[in-house]
């Protein structure tokens, strides 16, 4: 996928629609206990995007959450149907995490890593072709160089604008 192609997504009822103006930086499946409780599922798949590339239409509400790591975040939901659309993690400066399965074509963005597999359901088998991490990983080691460069460039521009 080209970097400048638009990607669309929505909540279940269609009241919240969004567009991502660049391809995601990285997609991962999280098996931590918090994500399981929050989603009512065995894991969640998130696609990390630069904050300035997500354009949301429709009314969302948010809830402050604290991850198992202690990191704070805000989860954004459709006010009508409650679909959890994206998250803003305090620790992910300049990035937002879109719920990959809310994309129109989520299969274009399969997980590039599985994290917190220490909490993975024992009956769930994972692909041997995808990196698995007991807990979290270091993005500087795991993410593609192109994604790391995009983040670095964006944060540099953002810093220059704020000065």
Task: List each model region and its residues.
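A short Gly-Trp-Pro
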Residues: 1-10, 15-163
């Amino acid at each position: 996928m080209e970097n400048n192609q638009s990607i669309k997504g929505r909540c279940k009822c269609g009241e919240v629609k969004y567009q991502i103006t660049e391809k995601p930086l990285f997609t991962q499946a999280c098996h931590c206990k918090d994500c399981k409780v929050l989603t009512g599922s065995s894991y969640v798949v998130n696609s990390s995007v630069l904050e300035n590339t997500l354009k949301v239409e429709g009314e969302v509400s948010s809830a402050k959450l604290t991850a198992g790591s202690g990191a704070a975040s805000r989860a954004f939901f459709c006010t009508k149907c409650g679909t959890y659309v994206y998250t803003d993690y305090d620790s992910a400066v300049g990035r937002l995490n879109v719920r990959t399965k809310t994309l129109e074509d989520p299969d274009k963005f399969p997980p590039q890593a599985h994290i917190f597999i220490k909490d993975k359901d024992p009956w769930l088998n994972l692909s041997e072709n995808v990196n698995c991490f007991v807990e979290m990983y270091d993005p500087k080691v795991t993410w593609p160089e192109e994604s790391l460069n995009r983040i670095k460039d964006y944060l540099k521009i953002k810093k220059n604008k704020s000065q």
